Amino acid sequence: MVAKLQISVFCVWGLLQSNRSPTLKMPPVKGRPRTTPRAATRSTTDELARRLKGGLTVITPRFSWHALYPIAEEDHRQYLTDPVAALPPAVIDLLPRIGIVLAPYLERPAAKGAVEVVEKKPAEPKLVLSTRVVNDELAMLFFTTRGEQVADYHYFLFDEIAALLSQRWPDEVQENWHRLLREELSAEVHGEVDDRSWRLKQGLLRRPMAARKDGKPFRDYARESFRDTVTLYLHGICCDIDVEAGPRQLPSRYLRKRLESLKSLFPPPPEHYVFPEDVPRS
């Protein structure tokens, strides 16, 4: 059954069409963490990543998982099977091995401190929804899941995967993306997909036109823009998304062009779709 997901970021209604998922609003850009194996103790995600890496349960050759509190067996599909099955093969090929860790709550006790898994829900400023620990060829992705809607979890899962991809994108993908963004900047297109890239774009737009299309500020913006757009793209393949227009949104024709580019670079797996017209008529 296809459910509707309403996203209150900067995109356009009804652009993405896919398979399965709940109804929800996209959460703010801010991480939240999950829980410890032992209620009486706090463990940092770094400590848990070291401890858990040998005891993960395999989903696919590239993906494994572990729950730090009881998860009903009937929930495994929406937390694990469906989102992993929706990933394009070309995306999977670029990723390290990934361990998905479902925690009750994640907390950052101090502004620059380590993220910890805790049993009780932290105060809102300390709550983290997702974080990652990357060592060698294993990335451990931690998520706050207790009391969170599955659609929120999906957003953060795909955002963490997009972040990994943005650190490993091949030259061909990078050049393609840079070309798209330079065209947008030449046309003085305003708006973005999400808050991170929007803020970096504002800084870039304050520079002289000749200085906008290269250099570190441009590359930083391009990486975040790629991450935000890939998050939306992957989420849309997994789930049926209605995107709610916002005042900072990227104009729909430019967003569509980005998604078409990602579709050509990272085609969806069989029986998963990007645009409404991709869905076979019954």
Functional labels for PLM-detected ranges:
Residues 151, 155, 166-204, 243-248:
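Post-HEXXH active-site segment of zinc metalloproteases
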